[in-house]
Each structure stands twice: as structure tokens, then as C-alpha cells.
């Protein structure tokens, strides 16, 4: 019998949630996703030193201003890592906009344009890129405009139905609902443990998936942020699942037989009127878990972005 990972691949597109080239070679995913935390981790891998050196040298040619050099080196490094990953995956790479721009639509759009340009200068067509944005109202509005330009987006840090609905209504290419972080919040809040079937993160993604399919939305649902393979198995059939190397290894070493759990609706019905900004903010605010986890996620990505910039600043000074 095929291992659990190979079985899963027959129902769901598997995406590697890592910047580690060796892990991607090992598990042969369709796509890969990165974020500031993963870029920071990847930047400490010795094999990547040439990519960092290239980003530093390039940034020095763009500007004499150190703050601009740091910004440029950070963007160039993310793209350099993405370009390497794209040599190994047949599909797409997700590269994230600076989390500190999560509440600034115009600057998010400008950063997305810059990342796309850097990829194109490296010979990568925009059809192989997903621009990652936090699922704030401003991020969703930025994505709507980018999608209209033909730049596909991955809306991340998604914890609530309101965020998912707004993304679909904006015509976003893909969303990344965070399964494990939802579970973390509920375990801490209630003091209870949950099995995979009743896992609040699994329940959330299932609800979003069913809503999208019932209403004929084309937005791809990509479950993310897993804590155990039980969550992953319960979401077999989801459009895509992005999984870190340790859980990919566990799935590859497992012989558990799986069946699709998420099955698209056979008929669709028209959706209602799109959410207004006021409705979105109210609905989102009614979910304390989502409010907490979105804010925390943005803060933590910003912290790791800052750590990366400290490292780059030291290298730029040499």
C-alpha cells in the first residue's frame, strides 16, 4: 500500500511550507510557500550564503541609503530563495509582503509590484508567483486590485469565516486558513484537548471549503499551519494543503489508509451581496479567536522580518 503522503497526493495538491531546498527535493511537492519566519530560518542554512551575498551586492547597487539597502536586500533574498525553489517545484511559489504593511493597501500593492518585477528580472513569469498578504481588510482590498492586474494572491493569516468570505468576494486566487493556530487558541482558552474530527481548525476549514463550493467560488482553499497529521488526514480532499517538513516526513512514514473527507458540492447556489467594510469589521470583531490570532500573527512575522533585517544590516556594513 502507498504511504499516507502518496495517498493524500491523489486527493489534494501538496505544498511544502518551507524554504529548505533539501526538504523540497525529498518530498516533491507541487508548490511551496514561504513567509518571513521561514526566510529567516532559511537564511541561516549554509547552502544559502551565496543567495544572501547576491542580495547584499544587488542592494548596494540600487541605493547608497542604508535603510533602502536593507529593504532591497530583504526583498531580493526572498526572491532569490523563491527562484531556487521554483527549480524544484512544477507549480508556484508564495512570497510574502512585509507584514508591517498589513494595514496599508497602497504600500502593499507597491511591494507586490516590486516582488513581481524582481522575479521577472530573474526570468520567472508572474504565473508562477503568488503574492502573500495578511487577510486584513486592507490586504484583501490590495489583493482585489492585484488580481484585476493579473497578479495572483495568497491571503494568509486567515482565521475566520468573515475573512474567507471577503476573500472570495474579492476574487482572490487562494486563501490559507490556519488550522493549527486556531486549535492552539481553543486549547488555551478552554483547557480541553480535541480529536482531529472535532478540531476547531479542521471544522473552520471544512466550513469555508463547503461554502466556497456551494456558491461556486473559484478561490482555492489551502489549509495551513498544522499541528499533527490527524488534522491533515481530516482535510484530505481540500484543494491544497501546505505542510512543513516534519509532518511531511511523518506522512511519508505512515501507512494509514485515507479517504477524501472534503467533497465539492454537486450543485451551486448564488451567493448574497458582498460584505461591506463595516460588515466585515463587525463580523470579524465578533470572533475573539480570529482577532487575537491575526494580530499575533502580524506581530510575529514583523518581529522575524526585523531579525532578518538586523542580519542583513550587519552584512551590508561589511
Curated annotation (Swiss-Prot):
Pathway: Carbohydrate degradation; pentose phosphate pathway; D-glyceraldehyde 3-phosphate and beta-D-fructose 6-phosphate from D-ribose 5-phosphate and D-xylulose 5-phosphate (non-oxidative stage): step 2/3. It holds the Pfam family TAL_FSA. GO terms for cellular component: cytosol. InterPro entries: Aldolase_TIM (IPR013785), TAL/FSA (IPR001585), Transaldolase_1 (IPR004730), Transaldolase_AS (IPR018225). It is an enzyme of class 2 (transferase). GO terms for biological process: carbohydrate metabolic process; pentose-phosphate shunt. It catalyses: D-sedoheptulose 7-phosphate + D-glyceraldehyde 3-phosphate = D-erythrose 4-phosphate + beta-D-fructose 6-phosphate. Its EC number is 2.2.1.2. Keywords: Cytoplasm, Pentose shunt, Schiff base, Transferase. The active site is at residue 132. It is found in: Cytoplasm. CDD domains: Transaldolase_TalAB (cd00957). The keyword Protease does not apply. The keyword Transferase applies. One of its GO terms (molecular function) is transaldolase activity. NCBIfam families: PRK12346.1 (NF009001), talAB (TIGR00874). Transaldolase is important for the balance of metabolites in the pentose-phosphate pathway. Homodimer. Belongs to the transaldolase family. Type 1 subfamily. This is Transaldolase. It comes from Shewanella sp. (strain MR-7).
